[in-house]
């Protein structure tokens, strides 16, 4: 009788759970496994490159909130998919998720070159405001058309590490083999007199070591994580001013997203949005930590002031901005949308 009464008492509880849409615990056999790829060094949820940590935080929280219905396998360091192939893999549904420098795909989707347009973004808050403005909605639509969904918005500032001489003003770039990370950034550096070599950030160490590159522009996180301080003699940081801001979001294949239940989709988007505060905090910390790490390694540390920034911006408008406006479909309209966000 006691067992029967206990079971009867549980009936309304079970019914309430069903009605509320709360996910029920999943067995290992029933769980959906989602694979996440990225090109950055692997670590733990508490230590290492913040991008790897963010991915692990996302996976842990989504698995917790879905009661194990969704589980994740994380592949750092380009171990599953090569860096520049990740968006294509998302588009075809061959890969579930990635944290990815979107401008890497500017050849396939020219419009996304605006996400590493030199001197367009001038501070983090401006970049994050794109999300709810027309430029952000247009970017979301473009990615949707390519079977890709933005889960977490991440903007990163960056600087330049060099082993020949300091690079502060545009003229310092003349005659050097340089890497800007995207078409528009490379156009600026070319206009400044640099010779462009395009490599993903996880190959910059070997490129600089072998002499393929004299200078590397990349995010503060990558300048530290890929240990370029072991090779550089000078670094110009982003802690005061920089023309280098890159959109590097956490993305999911729409094929994967559409295969989730409405409740699972809701959890994925909520967790993704919740990690944006962690991302911006980590990036600002990395901008400062970069100077500390490089200084400790004996590298000469430099900063950019407003006057120098305006020199780069003038050259960017004459080169990368103009090319984008003239040669990309709706390029002028997209640039106007972006510049409307302050």
Located regions from the model:
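Short beta-strand-centered segments that line the small-molecule binding cleft or hinge
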Residues: 129
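N-terminal secretory/targeting leader peptides
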Residues: 29-126, 135, 143-342
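Bacterial N-terminal signal peptides that target proteins for export
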Residues: 1-11, 21-22
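C-terminal segment of classical bacterial N-terminal signal peptides
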Residues: 16-25
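Alpha-helical scaffold segments in soluble metabolic enzymes
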Residues: 138
